[in-house]
Amino acid sequence: MLKLLSEIGPVIAFFAGFFYGGGIQNATLYMLITAIICVTICYFVDKKVSKLSIISVSVLLVSGIITLISGNSIYIKIKPTILYVIFGIIFLMSGIRKNPFIKYALESIVRLKEESWITLSYRAAAFFFFMAVVNEIVWRNFSDETWVKFKVFGVIPITFIFILLQLPLLLKNKLPDSKI
């Protein structure tokens, strides 16, 4: 539950900052502060921070600080695209190399046959590349307000649907000692 909150907390802070705090600059500041707090709490509770979280927060810090200094919102808008492409490449390459990164991220929750991890890696890569394209379309063609709403009311449900669509693969190929 803590991991989920640390992932969506900064997005919620961004949304609230945009609509109640006066625009993208304040939203970016709120998201940066929330992300740093969430990662710090996760570190003290779990004694570790995942590699994906480190990558996410690092890209957020760079794009967020540049956005705040320059006053140009393009940097915070391309942050999701950059992250999605990085994650897509990580999952694609780990699938190609037959050493699925997703296995290390999810193995504590579910144990699968090895070929299923590879399939899941390719699916995750396709999902992240798709999300990169969608983010580019939305921020380049719609208002800041629409883009911010999409981050909350679009990205979260799309991600949830993607996860649900993976359940048949997970349930069919889970090992007997799996937690799900």
Swiss-Prot record:
Disulfide bonds: none annotated. Belongs to the YciB family. This is Inner membrane-spanning protein YciB. NCBIfam families: ispZ (TIGR00997), PRK00259.1-1 (NF001323). InterPro entries: YciB. Plays a role in cell envelope biogenesis, maintenance of cell envelope integrity and membrane homeostasis. Keywords: Cell inner membrane, Cell membrane, Membrane, Transmembrane, Transmembrane helix. GO terms for cellular component: plasma membrane. The gene is yciB.
